[in-house]
Curated annotation (Swiss-Prot):
Name this polypeptide is given: UvrABC system protein B
Location of this chain's protein in the cell: Cytoplasm
SMART domains assigned: DEXDc, HELICc
Species this protein is from: Syntrophotalea carbinolica (strain DSM 2380 / NBRC 103641 / GraBd1)
Gene designation per UniProt: uvrB
Function as written in the Swiss-Prot or TrEMBL entry: The UvrABC repair system catalyzes the recognition and processing of DNA lesions. A damage recognition complex composed of 2 UvrA and 2 UvrB subunits scans DNA for abnormalities. Upon binding of the UvrA(2)B(2) complex to a putative damaged site, the DNA wraps around one UvrB monomer. DNA wrap is dependent on ATP binding by UvrB and probably causes local melting of the DNA helix, facilitating insertion of UvrB beta-hairpin between the DNA strands. Then UvrB probes one DNA strand for the presence of a lesion.
Major localisation: cytoplasm
Keyword Cytoplasm: yes
Amino acid sequence: MAKFNLKSNYQPRGDQPQAIEELSTGLQRGDKHQVLLGVTGSGKTFTMANVVAQVQRPTLVLAHNKTLAAQLYGEFKELFPDNAVEYFVSYYDYYQPEAYVPTTDTFIEKDSSINEEIDKMRHSATRSLLSRNDVLIVSSVSCIYGLGSPEAYYGMLIRLETGMQLDRNALLKNLVEIQYDRNDVDFHRGTFRVRGDTVEIFPAYEEKRALRIEFFGDEIDAICEIDPLRGKVLDRLERTAVFPASHYVATRPTLDRAIREIQDELRERLTWFRENNMLLEAQRIEQRTMFDIEMIEEMGYCQGIENYSRFLDGRQAGQPPATLFDYFPDDALLFIDESHVTVSQIGAMYRGDRSRKETLVRYGFRMPSALDNRPLTFEEFEAKGIQTIYVSATPADYELRKADGVVVEQIIRPTGLLDPPIDVRPAKDQVDDLIHEIRLTIKQNERVLVTTLTKRMAEELTGYLGELGIKVRYLHSDIDTVERMQILRELREGLFDVLVGINLLREGLDIPEVSLVAILDADKEGFLRSERSLIQTCGRAARNVAGRVIMYADRITRSMRACLDETERRRTAQLAYNEEHGITPQTVKKSLRSILEDIAEKDYVELPQVAEELGDYHTPQDVKNEIARVKEEMLAAAANLEFEKAAELRDRMLELDKLELSIRNVK
């Protein structure tokens, strides 16, 4: 049985050995909840990896956004190169859920763009969980969404062995049942092709390896791993297993039972609509559901089959769906990174999903069973009972309460770096003073983060700094994950010097080149200027030996005072450690190359900085620029749940695609 094998040039130092020992002992003792209070730059990820290596248990690391998840994935991949480190986040680049707007009688079909690379990584994650123990998965809150039954997923895998008696056509039928498509021309993930007595399968969880099954009559003569592009044999296997191409698979008896239950619910729903004189809704639900039933009967699946997952899984109404947690064994370990943010996100997912689907059910677009295709509620998440370690520089009250107030502290940085000194300055001339400090920092070839209170102020400040010749970018919530990663990398590379944001410059941004963090209007008490937010924001300058923080404020608030006191406490402890061990602080050295860089390069689209006015288009490039602008608006509308507007923008984008093609043909 494979074991976690931690590989690193470093040994635990500072507070790390004590933290590793206390957390590991707590897990072995059976403690359900523990808190690791680790300051920025103290090596929390390294501590987590050491705990995993000590307890040797399948592990889920939960992050609150894709950017942080990608960063953690890269770090764990380097620490455990011989183990199954996987990445499980939403595979949608763009996702517009189906929705109905009663006020305008507008139904918006589900529309999405799937990132094939991330889809492959999701399949790789579930496959690893069901085939080995040395698995560490880094996930976003996608892990609490319905995924399909692990029993069905594992039960329908196809086991193949050299010398095995198997009819070739039976194998082809089995592949179709687990949702592989036959394609003899375009061989890609999730397809198979047939050439005489040879069947080649491209597993959904692979990228550079496919399988070649050679038959001699009704016997498997050989199994090979091949290069899918060149057809070259990479390895010869005695046995292998092919996992399904979808997480929503079911045997024929299960499908037949599900169809009967769907028909029963449909009859009940039709009776209810007719009794309430809702004839249009009755016709609508009957037409849509009967079409889905026919597709399931003939093909084994339909578009939106996840809405019938309750019947496929054999669940009762209201029972929680199967999620990634159900693919883990009982002795799994859970780390919740930046827990003060991530925990609150978990509860919010269910409420937003429920509201949209209730409208669809009420107006006959979906049956009530669709409500059970949902994320876990917070109570269901808690009921999983997995041993959990909450990791944060600023643990919230919930985590502290769960751990009975016991906290494992990690405030000493092995690098010797101190928490940045904080300078409080008057808010009256904050912009002029900020410009002066930015120019001083740029002269040192270092970067600046600026955090504002409002989106409008961030936009105006970005524009003003740009007019002064300062290379500046604005990071906001409408920017998708891949582009956000690209922006952060460009900041590190020095393509621009100043990054302005609101609430996105706090948790998890690991940028050693940043030596100045400026907090405007620091005395405006609220969520963005709470004690935890201020400590987190200040921490962004803690990876540079010259790191410093400027708070612009006309008074010292309670949150500011708490932040100043905690920072001073940590500086004092770090100074004492440095003197005792003769450590000279040095800026963190971190490679620019990201483990997910290839994905970013494939999917990154540079959006135009200035939106062009609608008008006549003279070149394909003009149309491309307009398509990019419309796409940005569409993504923003979808993120704000403005489904009707997003659908209109999507249609506009499709029209522009046709226009670009016609212009190219004319040219």
